[in-house]
């Protein structure tokens, strides 16, 4: 796991190995995985693997993160782990673009939501504007979900 996180910053960004390893350890602690530094990815749960991938991305010090359905392949019981990590990143003002069907999560974390229908932006705005939109397709979509 630690090598998985440190490889790109060392090889691509040519950063100092010691600095990168220290940062990776901090990222693993932040992800709740400090005890997994020497584990192999196959020894981790899906949620743990996803958190390692987020740590790997953060190790590159990006200005923005992109997530495409970050919880879709996870056991429902592990979804909360990933949503908490993303929520914590939002609280730290990390800019993120997240494609998700986790509508309650989007409502609570996003400062802007874009709802797309058939590849076209149908509704965009603040969570309040989007979730109270009178747009027919938006209402139909929300009606099929249990959004509080």
Model regions and ranges:
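Conserved ABC ATPase signature
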Residues: 40-44, 48
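A short, proline-enriched helix->beta-strand linker immediately N-terminal to the Walker B motif
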Residues: 59-63
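Catalytic Walker B motif of ABC-type/P-loop ATPase nucleotide-binding domains
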Residues: 65-68
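Helical segment within the ABC ATPase nucleotide-binding domain
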Residues: 79-92
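A short, surface-exposed alpha-helical micro-motif characterized by mixed small hydrophobic
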Residues: 106-108
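ABC ATPase "signature
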Residues: 124-125
